[in-house]
Amino acid sequence: MREVTIAAIQMSCSRDVKENIEKAAKLIRAAAEAGAQIILPSELFERQYFCQERRYDYYDYAKPLSENDAVQSMKALAKELGVVIPVSFYEAGEGRQLFNSVAVIDADGEVLGIYRKTHIPDDHYYQEKFYFTPGNTGFKAFKTRYATIGVGICWDQWFPETVRGMALKGAEILFYPTAIGSEPILECDSMPHWRRCMTGHAACNLMPVVAANRIGTEEVVPCAENGNQSSALTFYGSSFITDATGEVVEQMDRVTEGFILHSFDLDELESERKSWGLFRDRRPEMYGEN
């Protein structure tokens, strides 16, 4: 029996980087005290979601791994608490390329590696192509102290190729740091669709999925640098954990800060995957290159 307890934290983000990092650390510490061993913060939690507007000066937010405040703070916290923390951050990579990345920090405080967001959205007030180069790491599985995990980032979660790619690499649990909320043009609530998409991924790959989203309304202040844009996004939280069949076993509401956690037996999950034969019966030679 290999039991692991996983958690997702949910919080609002202010314009104060230090305040956001301290808030995330406080929630991670509380989750660890409750027994969590792998703890997921939301996407780009250092700041408010700056991709809502286009400003050239925001490129300066990107830092190399070794210089990012959130990563360095979480490395120390992971070592202190003996927990795994996948940390989303704005990365200044090689060749002056800028990436939306996750550093997977193991329970000894060391970075196991980086995943760079593969699928980059470009929509009203989710203008990520302005800031991020599409990731070049490919889908990865990270062997942490407690489990082998896969990490996708927000828009990645809408693509079944992301999940299957991580599953084929050996992932046992899938983690998605997220920043998603109101649709500024479409008059719809995308939350149920967002959640169903990932519960389906869990069911089709027979492995738990964890999604951590932010909450709160974030407003853009009109100025010359953003062309006098005036807008706002309300992030709908609803962070959740599924079991291997896609059943939501833990969830949060749309407005509350805090964390959720759940325990799984990894040996039992592996046995269940084998008994269903989903990976045995794959026919990749029939799927084509596209």
Name these PLM-found stretches:
Residues 63-66, 76, 93-178, 182-200, ...:
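Active-site catalytic loop in hydrolytic enzyme cores
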Residues 267-290:
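A conserved C-terminal secondary-structure "cap"
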Residues 1-38, 175:
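N-terminal active-site segment of His-dependent metallophosphoesterases
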Residues 6, 104-112, 242-249:
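Short, glycine-anchored, charge-dense loop/turn motifs used at functional sites
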